[in-house]
Regions:
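N-terminal Lys/Arg-rich, disordered targeting/topogenic segments
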Residues: 1-17
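Catalytic glycan-binding domains that act on GlcNAc-containing polysaccharides
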Residues: 36-203
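Hydrophobic membrane-insertion alpha-helices, especially the h-region
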Residues: 21-39
């Protein structure tokens, strides 16, 4: 008789533990689903994950230089998270993380005689130069955004060398074949972010 009571009590303890585990699992599932749906809510994404400061400036230079404004926004997000004071350990400056020597060359190309390194922290100038440079890379790589973005990250010289070494054509789209992991990740990130900006900020 005592053995029967012990088995009953043991079964009850097991059932209580199972019920507790089920409740905890259900709670976690509900919290996860709630978080997922909140994160899918467009105003939340725009406010916290895909912010868009300097929207008018981006649009202005995108129109002037015939660049997809969503691409420019995605590059800025990846490069600086829209922080105009950003300065990398390599010396890249501002919203679009331009190297001073590249910016000086761009200034010469567009005839901006007022350029100096400090002025790269100015949002308008940085976005202007960065957008012009994106347009130049797209022209150089025949409109191929994968190659243009790889060049923006790793340098046009490296991309030209990869094309020669691997017989890549201007129709190249195999991001996995890019030798640098940082550049592979960068290209994927920017292309994915461009899609999100296009969805969240339809023109």
């Amino acid at each position: 008789m005592q053995g029967f009571r012990d088995r009953v009590q043991q079964n009850r303890r097991v059932q209580r533990r199972m019920a507790t585990c089920f409740c905890v699992a259900l709670f976690i599932l509900l919290v996860s689903l709630s978080a997922f749906f909140v994160l899918q809510f467009e105003p939340v994404q725009r406010k916290y994950f895909y912010v868009y400061p300097y929207h008018d400036t981006v649009m202005k230079y995108a129109e002037i230089y015939h660049v997809d404004s969503n691409l420019t926004a995605a590059v800025i997000k990846s490069e600086s998270k829209f922080k105009h004071t950003a300065l990398s350990h390599r010396g890249a400056v501002g919203l679009m993380q331009l190297m001073p020597e590249t910016a000086e060359w761009i200034a010469g190309q567009i005839g901006d005689k007022s350029y100096n390194v400090e002025s790269l922290h100015e949002p308008d100038r940085n976005i202007r130069y960065g957008t012009w440079y994106l347009a130049e890379l797209q022209r150089e790589f025949k409109g191929n955004d994968v190659l243009a973005l790889a060049a923006y990250n790793a340098g046009r010289g490296n991309v030209k060398a990869w094309m020669d070494e691997n017989n890549w054509s201007y129709s190249f789209h195999d991001i996995d074949a890019i030798p640098y992991k940082e550049t592979r990740d960068y290209v994927r990130q920017v292309i994915g972010d461009r899609k999100k900006y296009r969805e969240l900020y339809p023109e």
